[in-house]
């Protein structure tokens, strides 16, 4: 019996230099779609392959990539990743991407906090009733105030903002707070965050 492939379209959005393209590249690499992890600095990422993008070091157009994977029940899934530019000059491309997706991931630079374009795009995603998630980038930076950042995000987007993952004490790895209820985290209590998720689900 032929199995129908599930299609997911995910928009990656954020203010410029927050790490959208780096996240997209990491997703492609970890899923086995590309053999080597490129970097924006080297100009060899899948999504920033335009000569101008390589020259200026950031996205200037909407890029599309895809990831082939499977659900836990082995149903095949193709995830279409839309990497948005992140500059106000290209806001039209960012907004048009929202019309093609069901979910968005907003990348927040832990050293900079929630920036203007990220707020604007998340509001636009909310207005379209899209599923929204937040990816905190550069959390390993010792100068990143993670407690302050979480408070800022909750003030902007509400108390429902909870970390699914918490950084370990040395900030080199993360602890999955959804499946686990114990661990030595750098901020907050894994047990308390896990309990908060369970209460929301129940």
Question: Residue spans of the language-model regions?
Answer:
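P-loop NTPase switch module centered on the Walker A-proximal segment
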Residues: 1-108, 157
């Amino acid at each position: 019996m032929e199995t129908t492939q599930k299609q997911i379209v995910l928009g990656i959005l954020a203010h410029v230099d927050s790490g959208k393209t780096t996240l997209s590249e990491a997703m492609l690499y970890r899923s086995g779609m590309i053999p080597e992890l490129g970097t924006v600095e080297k100009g060899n990422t899948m999504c920033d392959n335009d000569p101008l993008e390589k020259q200026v070091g950031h996205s200037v157009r909407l890029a599309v990539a895809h990831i082939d994977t499977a659900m836990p029940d082995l149903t095949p899934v193709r995830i279409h990743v839309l990497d948005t530019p992140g500059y106000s000059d290209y806001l039209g491309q960012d907004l048009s991407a929202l019309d093609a997706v069901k979910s968005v991931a907003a990348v927040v630079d832990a050293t900079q906090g929630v920036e203007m374009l990220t707020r604007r795009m998340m509001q636009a995603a909310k207005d379209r009733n899209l599923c929204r998630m937040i990816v905190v980038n550069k959390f390993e930076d010792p100068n990143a105030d993670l407690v302050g950042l979480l408070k800022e995000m909750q003030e902007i987007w509400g108390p429902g903002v909870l970390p699914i993952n918490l950084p370990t004490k040395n900030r080199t790895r993360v602890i999955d707070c959804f499946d686990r209820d114990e661990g030595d985290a750098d901020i907050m209590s894994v047990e308390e965050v896990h309990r908060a998720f369970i209460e929301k689900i129940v």
